[in-house]
């Protein structure tokens, strides 16, 4: 049975890890958010979150977005490729309700799964 936890090993913690993803990422985005990805050397997908105060002024709004993204990642982690993912919030993300945000993120995860399969088939 697969564990559906979001442990420390599944998180991007150091700035150098984020920088590696920002250098040459695969992108999947909508008007409100972007998920960047880059292949990693570990055998699990990892997630980093960036939600700028510029886009969401209140801490509870930023925390809501991060909580939904973490939950989505936690449920989808065993289907995702071994990539480092960075979630980037854009202007207007605060206007999305929880269900819409969850569905949008799920669609972007699916797009990243497809992108990784295409990249593997080229190699």
From Swiss-Prot:
**Presence of the UniProt keyword Acyltransferase in the record:** no
Under Pfam families, the record lists: Ribonuclease_P (PF00825)
Q: What class of enzyme is it?
A: hydrolase
PROSITE patterns on file: RIBONUCLEASE_P
**MF GO annotations:** 3'-tRNA processing endoribonuclease activity; ribonuclease P activity; tRNA binding
GO biological process assignments: tRNA 5'-leader removal
Q: Name one GO cellular component term.
A: ribonuclease P complex
Q: Which InterPro entries match?
A: Ribosomal_Su5_D2-typ_SF, Ribsml_uS5_D2-typ_fold_subgr, RNase_P, RNase_P_CS
Q: What is its EC number?
A: 3.1.26.5
Q: Its domain of life? A: Bacteria
Q: Quickly give the catalysed reaction.
A: Endonucleolytic cleavage of RNA, removing 5'-extranucleotides from tRNA precursor
Record keywords, A-Z: Endonuclease, Hydrolase, Nuclease, RNA-binding, tRNA processing
Provide the coiled-coil residue spans. none
What NCBIfam families does UniProt report for this protein, alphabetically? rnpA
Q: What does this protein do?
A: RNaseP catalyzes the removal of the 5'-leader sequence from pre-tRNA to produce the mature 5'-terminus. It can also cleave other RNA substrates such as 4.5S RNA. The protein component plays an auxiliary but essential role in vivo by binding to the 5'-leader sequence and broadening the substrate specificity of the ribozyme.
Entry similarity comment: Belongs to the RnpA family.
> Quaternary form?
Consists of a catalytic RNA component (M1 or rnpB) and a protein subunit.
Q: What is this protein called?
A: Ribonuclease P protein component
| Species the sequence originates in | Haemophilus ducreyi (strain 35000HP / ATCC 700724)
Give the source lineage, highest ranks first.
Answer: Bacteria, Pseudomonadati, Pseudomonadota, Gammaproteobacteria, Pasteurellales
């Amino acid at each position: 049975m697969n564990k559906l936890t979001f442990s420390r090993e599944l998180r991007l913690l150091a700035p150098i890890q984020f920088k590696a993803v920002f250098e040459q990422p695969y992108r999947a985005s909508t008007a409100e958010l972007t998920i960047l990805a880059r292949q990693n050397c570990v055998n699990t997908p990892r997630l980093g979150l960036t939600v700028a105060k510029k886009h969401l002024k209140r801490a509870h709004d930023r925390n809501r977005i991060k909580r939904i993204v973490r939950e989505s990642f936690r449920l989808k982690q065993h289907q995702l490729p071994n990539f480092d993912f960075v979630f980037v919030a854009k202007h207007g993300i605060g206007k999305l309700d929880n269900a819409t945000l969850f569905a949008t993120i799920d669609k972007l995860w699916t797009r990243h799964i497809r992108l990784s399969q295409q990249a593997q088939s080229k190699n």
